Amino acid sequence: DDVATFIGVDKEKVKFYDHHTCHVMYGYYANPNRKNKTIGITIDAYGDGRNQTIWKIENNKFELIADSAECDIARLYRMVTLYLRMKPLEHEFKVMGMAPYAKDKYANEVVKVFDGLLKFDGLRIVRDSRPDNLYEFLNEKLKYFRFDNIAGGLQKYTENMLVAELQQYANHLN
């Protein structure tokens, strides 16, 4: 009501959309190749109490299928950014940018460091064996890896999780 009063419109014209709904709607409506049936996935640091959502979109109707507040992929990026002595919540793009320079052999070893931190609970990505102090865990486990291989390993881990997410959803449909 306060917003409607402030901008001088009927309250029926004002709608609230949470953080992840805005992300998925933007991704859907900005896509010139959108189809009648679409899956929408959001994974980010945190917004409105969650950091992962999965949506079924059909005929411009958005149905939330699953969500999680334990999908720590963005937290891993933030901690790796800090570990690499860059500014968290600002320089994650630099970590992503270094990933292509990694050697597969070493990046695959880094993936093993992240494996087991998260798991699937149905369609939700949740914590599995995440240590209490993630930074110290990374400090111990990554100390012998080069920066580019750390970035590449984190990127591969993220891609593996997202592909698995899509496979989970496909299995859910069958």
Label the model's feature ranges.
Residues 1-174:
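Short acidic/glycine-rich loops and adjacent helix/strand connectors
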